[in-house]
């Protein structure tokens, strides 16, 4: 059987590396190409056409590593969101602690899927890029990043205790 007739390896390798990283008490992260069609991620956290997503069990809910896409729920800046990433957009999986993992090589099946999805999106009028899960909306738009340090509490002199009888 010709290699082009086989199903893509990426979903199987992704699941294997994910389990291996967890078995070794490491934190799995996905590198995603946000420029490909069908990617639903919080674009405000993307840099240079990519986003890195923590997919550790403590960071996400309802994680599905399916054969066609990765789906999960997560909070970004306190806002619950649903993330969906086609496997063609998954570039790598690695451990935050030591970089162990792999980059995925291009596969012909994903090149065909991407061209089909580009054609479909060109004919679509309107598509939601990112949706809020439970209707929560931020009260204000701020430019904070998840890696920023938390704000320092105000300094107001000595703390005071009082006796309550």
UniProtKB/Swiss-Prot annotation:
Self-association and partners:
Homodimer. Binds 1 ssrA-tag per monomer; if the first Asn residue of the ssrA tag is mutated to Ala, SspB no longer binds the protein or stimulates ClpX-ClpP degradation. Binds the N-terminus (residues 1-108) of RseA with and without sigma-E; although ssrA and the N-terminal fragment of RseA both bind to SspB competitively they bind in opposite directions in its peptide-binding groove.
UniProt entry tagged with the keyword Protease: no
Residue ranges for the region (Binds SspB) are 73-95
The record's InterPro entries line, in alphabetical order, gives: SspB (IPR007481), SspB-like_sf (IPR036760)
Q: What is the effect of changing residue 52 to I?
A: 2.5-fold reduction in binding of RseA, no effect on ssrA-tag binding
Pfam families, from UniProt? Answer: SspB (PF04386)
- GO molecular function: any one? molecular adaptor activity
**UniProt-recorded name of the protein:** Stringent starvation protein B
Biological classification of the source: Bacteria, Pseudomonadati, Pseudomonadota, Gammaproteobacteria, Enterobacterales
Q: Which organism is it from?
A: Escherichia coli (strain K12)
Induction note? By amino acid starvation.
């Amino acid at each position: 059987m010709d290699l082009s007739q086989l199903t893509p390896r990426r979903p199987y390798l992704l699941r294997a590396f994910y389990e291996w990283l967890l078995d070794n008490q490491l934190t799995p992260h996905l590198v995603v190409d946000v420029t490909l069609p069908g990617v639903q991620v919080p674009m405000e956290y993307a840099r240079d056409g990519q986003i890195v997503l923590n997919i550790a069990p403590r960071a996400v809910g309802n994680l599905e590593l399916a054969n066609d896409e990765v789906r999960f729920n997560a909070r970004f800046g306190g806002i619950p969101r649903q993330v969906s990433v086609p496997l063609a957009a998954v570039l790598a999986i690695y451990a935050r602690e030591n970089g162990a993992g792999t980059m995925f090589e291009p596969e012909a099946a994903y090149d065909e899927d991407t061209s089909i999805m580009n054609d479909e999106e060109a004919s679509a009028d309107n598509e939601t890029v990112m949706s809020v899960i439970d209707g929560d909306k931020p009260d204000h738009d701020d430019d904070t990043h998840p890696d920023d340090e938390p704000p320092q509490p105000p300094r107001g002199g000595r703390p005071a205790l009082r006796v309550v009888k």
